């Protein structure tokens, strides 16, 4: 399973996205990311800031998105968004 870059990176993302994801703890945030990777739709895209290749998983039933490094070894971000976002706002998205 993919890991977060660091404890600080995980904590920062948890604090930014916890309310919208409705999770009360870091462990629930991590479990939610792992579940999204398990059940979500795989797609590829390019990072909007760095243009680096990325892998995404999106669960259209919950609106949960996880962005990973291109080798899927590192979780880079985790938040809730619309299907339209993963289709059209992420550069080069292969999500259908």
Predicted features along the sequence, with ranges:
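Basic/aromatic recognition patch in beta-strand/loop cores that engages polyanionic ligands
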Residues: 45-71
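Low-complexity, compositionally biased segments
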Residues: 12-16, 20, 50, 62, ...
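A short, surface-exposed interaction/processing loop segment used at functional sites
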Residues: 66-96
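Compact soluble domain cores
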Residues: 1-54
């Amino acid at each position: 399973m993919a890991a977060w870059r660091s404890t600080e990176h995980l904590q920062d993302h948890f604090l930014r996205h916890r309310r919208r994801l409705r999770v009360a703890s870091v462990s629930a945030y991590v479990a939610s990311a792992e579940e999204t990777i398990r059940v979500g739709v795989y797609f590829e895209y390019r990072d909007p800031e760095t243009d680096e290749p990325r892998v995404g998983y999106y669960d259209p039933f919950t609106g949960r998105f996880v962005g990973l490094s291109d080798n899927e070894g590192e979780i880079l971000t985790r938040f809730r968004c619309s299907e339209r976002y993963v289709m059209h706002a992420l550069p080069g998205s292969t999500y259908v």
